[in-house]
Amino acid sequence: MRDIFSFFEKPKDPLSFSAIRISLASPEKIREWSHGEVKKPETINYRTFKPERDGLFCAKIFGPVKDYECNCGKYKRMKHRGIVCEKCGVEVIQSKVRRERLGHISLATPVAHIWFLKSLPSRIGNMLDITLKDLEKVLYCEAYIVIDPKETGLMRGDLLSEERYLQLLDEYGDDKFSAGMGGEAILEMLKQVDVHGLAELLRTEMRAATSEAKRKKLAKRLKVVEAFRESGNRPEWMMLTVIPVLPPDLRPLVPLDGGRFATSDLNDLYRRVINRNNRLKRLLELNAPEIIIRNERRMLQEAVDALFDNGRRGKTITGPNKRPLKSLSDMLKGKQGRFRQNLLGKRVDYSGRSVIVVGPTLRLHQCGLPKKMALELFKPFIYNKLEERGYVNTIKSAKKMVEKERPEVWDILEEVISEHPVLLNRAPTLHRLGIQAFEPVLIEGKAIQLHPLVCAAFNADFDGDQMAVHVPLSVEAQMEARVLMMSTNNILSPASGKPIINPTQDIVLGLYYATRERKFEKGSYRADTLAFGEDGVAQGYLRGIYASLEEVRMAYDNGEVALHAGIRVRVPIIDDDGNPQLDEFGHVKRRIVETTVGRVIISEVLPKGVAFEYANKTLDKKALSALIDVCYRIHRNKETVLLADRLRTLGFDHAMRAGISICMDHMVIPPAKKVLLGEAQKEVERVVEQYQEGLITDGERYNKIVDIWASIADQVTTEMMAGIGKETVVDHETGKESIEPSFNPIYIMADSGARGSTQQIRQLAAMRGLMAKPSGEIIETPITANFREGLSVLQYFISTHGARKGLADTALKTANSGYLTRRLVDVAQDAVISEFDCGTLDGIRVAKLEEAGEVIQPLGDRILGRVALEDVVDPLTGEVLITANTELDEQAVRSIEDAGIEEVVIRSVLTCQLRRGVCALCYGRDLARGYRVNIGEAVGIIAAQSIGEPGTQLTMRTFHIGGTAARGKIEASYLEARTEGTVRLRRAVVQKKKDGTMVVMNRHGEIVVVDETGREREHNRLVYGAILKKADGERTKPGELLAEWDQFATPILTEVSGVVKFGDLIEGVSVQDRLDEVTGLSRKVVIESKAADVRPRISLKDPESGKTLKLPNSELEARYLLPVGAHIVAQEGDLIEAGEVIAKIPRDTTKVQDITGGLPRVAELFEARKPKDHAIISEIDGEVTFGKDTKGKRKVIITPYSPDGHALGDQAREYLIPKGKHIQVQPGDRVRAGDPLQDGPPNPHDILRVKGEKELSAWLVNEIQQVYRLQGVGINDKHIEVIVRQMLRRVRVREVGDTNFLVDEQVEKHIFEKENETVLERGGKPAIAEALLLGITKASLSTESFISASSFQETTKVLTEAAINGKTDDLRGLKENVIMGRLIPAGTGLPAYKRLQVVVEGEPVAQAPYVAPRPRPEETLTAVNEE
């Protein structure tokens, strides 16, 4: 009886284990797993199709082919369960055991496991201290190895050639030493290894080692030896004497028709191993000659290598069709491997897909599901209901009934579907909003209807996109779909916290049209219509003024007033929190506002508490977004959803009524275009003339011409927009004319944000402008025509470059972006909110973000939704505005900005002290929900998606412009004041020339504008060589010029007046006369010289004595070394004054900056790569001096100063800067730690070393944000911080102390801290480590979980490493749990929630609300633990 029960028992629940361990298998273990030895290479009998005995498919070893039936057919049926047939030896049992029973092959000679041999570093090699090359020689039978030298004077592990071996045998005899070749020799040596002794020996050697290289080598060996010591693995297990054989159903052999077979490659590989093994056994029995046996051994080793990892060593073994055979390693690796194909991505049942069409009448939580599709998807539910209702008695008849599509079936389908959410998904699913839940509504036809407002989240359009539908089956799944995934609960974007259900396209157009005002319409407000009679009684009435909003509606419905008429109306006054203001009698206060009829109609759909002001403006896309945002902040979910739906209906309705269409005449070409083009042409000619006279270089000419055309194109565009955007309106009553914003359809579309941009209209009606070559440079002759005038053949040809490049880029970059997302997800997957508060006392300082004096992001935007670390105090009154550890919500941010606070210290993920995961307070607000984050939220994955998703968007965005060269940020060449105040110079050295111009002579100067109270209003860095327009202490007004400079070249200025003398400027060696073909003029350019002692320079001599002049305030001489590529401006023998330019270093010509620069840049930052030609930065604060040059490199010395002003010479640091690089500092400059000494991009690892983790993370966040900002993509800083936190998880051990670490070992921070705590408790000396920045790929591969790392990249390497260390995976991350088939430990799968018991009392509720109630942040969940 018990057998019957055990037969029906469920498979092992994945929850029943808590960790998984990987280690090496000993030969005994393999034999223990095995159900028998495979002795023959035969598979199945090709006539009977029965497996051959002792072959690869043997039924005796692996189990029966048919359920409960032995091979010879003596025992059939269930009643003989568990009997072993005496005739054919097959156990009578279910055939599925053929999926789990292993066999084995006993090898005639030990072979090396290729993973431990070839996977670098070679573990066997490390264990025995033999190089891989020598090891292979021994294993592949090409040399002998000394196993035990005894008293011969040889060394253990020496290689001997054949002749030498024979010679030694003659000399000593075979009992005086032992040597061997092949697997046996290596196995013997590994057996002799004493792991503990070896570890001790290596540690002693390391202490004694002098050279760094030797220490590193010993540390590597020690690592492997330690791994074996701690894991309990034996070194000899890296050699195989027994090989396990995979269960046959995992490497099937399927007969095809026509007597052929389809087979798994593994069978071929096993067959080779068995054949060679049997042959070797036979040869050994026959005592064959040594050379034949050697050859056979080598072949066996090669066969086993191919089975484990084909192609790793030697030639790849190919099948009959010249295709490489897939080995066991290939089964795991890559996108098609076991991990990514079957464990991380599975196909699901109960799903369908179809084309989507727009559903303009759906509510936000609905989607239209075709009837036929629904019938198929909900079949089991329908069968169940049909039986319940008694329509049918069996499933079979239910099936028939459904197939006939009887009317009862449709009624039941309606019932089953109501309140049962389905999931819609559109590929590619780039962020979590790519899958959302909707309630299905049955529709005719075959296409799925989708609500237009969720298109932005899915990135869907209706040009043929397809979407998939999935049905959540269990009650729990349905509940999660409804509460967490319903489209109505995903109103805000998790990336930025802004609404994502913004109206787009027609809806925007309709609402914009409805809320525009048109002068002199029927029923407009007119102040001049009121006349008084002689008795002072009013005659007539005031037109266009209304007592209430309802009155306006009535007038409009009766045709008294037009939609666009400007009117006045009384409205209630509402405060910021959405409450109406009352007067002393308790009545609502009202006021009269100017508005239009359309705006009043729109205001009718606003929820109570949203002020009329939000509807009382022309509603373009931005205003609508703001309106939804405000509605969400005041009313939360339900009202916002209703508002969005109402706006959708109104928008479509008005767009239809407006009947907007476009034609050629709407593209008005500005009359000024001709004039402007003429002017530009003249300017270009002027520049060319300057070039021909030799005043400017070819590069400068190119830059200037491109600049001229870029600005002319902008001017023509401005003219055109002005022309399209304005029209003349005539008042029919008085005949007066007035110029008003126009209703030109093209203008309306762009202005409202519905479709198109200034960029595109400019191509239609102004000029196409500059285009880019395929190489990315800008062609200097622009396309002056526009599409209305039509392009000439040449112009059309130039245009095609851009268009083609756009398409090519898109294809390439989509892949890149997807890969970036994958790496980000992998590195951040285990960042989960695991506790409420970590109790940290550390945080980061945040101030407003400025660039080139312009505020890019105000302080409020940066701190919204974060948590304050300490009390925020008003600087003037000293009153505490916000207490520590409070979330900074909209109101708090407003009070901080009103108080004029410049910077706030907030808690950040970067400084969170939790060892695993992140705490809720350090993370702050959950952007997608708008309140504090819940415990269990998978913030790492959200961060990865938020960063990766726009990457793909951006890559796809390039080709819409059609390749018009949108020049990236052209660097500014001047600085204007933005506020009124007094100019102050800080740390700036200024030289006044004879003509009165002031030149900035140093690099770290700043110019500040202060107001009356002495508060700093703005401050900017001054560029070296800039010409100041305002002196220190001068007053300035907004818009006045403070300084200007040349943005195309960096000058080298002289600090003293004197005669120019060239040094080492030898024609053809260090300087070249670049002759300009066009102008015939030459210009000296410094080139790289081969000689080490040549140092091109310019010195300044005293005109009288001829001696080299000294620099001001120093003993150094006025010599200026010239970097490679510098253009020399001064002539030898000229008398020049201080502050003049003697040479220029040209900057690169501007290339088009689109996200091409962007994506690789983001990847480069996240991978923490060293940029090429990176800047050398100073590690300390101090004063600069120059030392003697060494090996053609310049020596810069920085000497620190003590607080009382003494130079600390013994702590000085020296830096060598390569010749030909431009040094940014001058002798005598004071530099701070982290300042660059030469130009070039900074190296993130240097920043970390010099300035620490906080500075580095601030820099990284800013650099990454810059790329996204350029594209107008908003991502919250905290997402990037989460990723940076994961990159900074590890430390590098510098000194080991009394811990078990090795020098230079990389360990997780929390393991390091834990180990140190243990050592300190014992009274030992702790280890010292330095922070380490890992790129995201490196960081993912070095996670604690080997399952997660191996499913990411380099599978074999990770598994090899893990097996040797005997690693245990505690299944803490998300990925490991998905692979093991468990619930992920995040969200509702959090261990804390698993123990929750839900008790239901009373009757079930008939109707569940479709909007999920949101847990208030105040109410904390109390868990009921089951005891």
Curated annotation (Swiss-Prot):
GO molecular function: DNA binding; DNA-directed RNA polymerase activity; magnesium ion binding; zinc ion binding
Keyword Metal-binding tagged: yes
Sorted UniProt keywords: DNA-directed RNA polymerase, Magnesium, Metal-binding, Nucleotidyltransferase, Transcription, Transferase, Zinc
Domain of life: Bacteria
Cofactor(s) the record lists: Mg(2+); Zn(2+)
Catalytic activity field: RNA(n) + a ribonucleoside 5'-triphosphate = RNA(n+1) + diphosphate
Gene Ontology process terms (BP): DNA-templated transcription
Residues that, per the record, bind Mg(2+): 461, 463, 465
EC number: 2.7.7.6
Assigned GO CC terms: DNA-directed RNA polymerase complex
Entry-linked NCBIfam families: rpoC_TIGR
Family membership noted in the UniProt record: Belongs to the RNA polymerase beta' chain family.
Quaternary data: The RNAP catalytic core consists of 2 alpha, 1 beta, 1 beta' and 1 omega subunit. When a sigma factor is associated with the core the holoenzyme is formed, which can initiate transcription.
Biological role: DNA-dependent RNA polymerase catalyzes the transcription of DNA into RNA using the four ribonucleoside triphosphates as substrates.
UniProt protein name: DNA-directed RNA polymerase subunit beta'
Organism: Sorangium cellulosum (strain So ce56) (Polyangium cellulosum (strain So ce56))
Gene: rpoC
